[in-house]
Amino acid sequence: MSWMFYSFIVFTLAIKEVIAIDGLEICSNDQLHVTIYSIFSPLFDKPKLNYYFNCSCPGSIYISDVYPKYFNDIAHIEYRCKLT
């Protein structure tokens, strides 16, 4: 199923941090919910982080535009609309 394919994506960042990003493909009510599970520092002290991004569907976002402290431009997300 396609939702299983999209539900768990792992990014390897240029700073050699490995994070798992879950639940990021749906833009609902102009918000994109991103749950980030940290494997290594600098996010190790917060193993689970929830972020909400403004979005318009369909589209994409670079997380580094919002949180440059933790991510770089490799952390790019493409998302789709929630079916209503």
Swiss-Prot record:
Tissue expression per record: Expressed by the venom gland.
Family of this protein: Belongs to the scoloptoxin-11 family.
Molecular functions (GO terms): potassium channel regulator activity; toxin activity
Annotated signal peptide: 1-16
Keyword Ribonucleoprotein: no
This protein's UniProt keywords: Disulfide bond, Ion channel impairing toxin, Neurotoxin, Potassium channel impairing toxin, Secreted, Signal, Toxin, Voltage-gated potassium channel impairing toxin
Superkingdom field: Eukaryota
Protein name per the record: Kappa-scoloptoxin(11)-Ssm3a
Main localization category: secreted
Post-translational modification, as annotated: Contains 2 disulfide bonds.
Gene Ontology annotations for the cellular component aspect, listed alphabetically: extracellular region
Compartments where found: Secreted
UniProt function note: Inhibits voltage-gated potassium channel currents in DRG neurons. 200 nM of the toxin inhibits current amplitude by only 25% and even at concentrations up to 5 uM, the toxin does not inhibit all potassium currents. In vivo, insects injected with this toxin showed signs of neurotoxicity including twitching, paralysis, and body contraction.
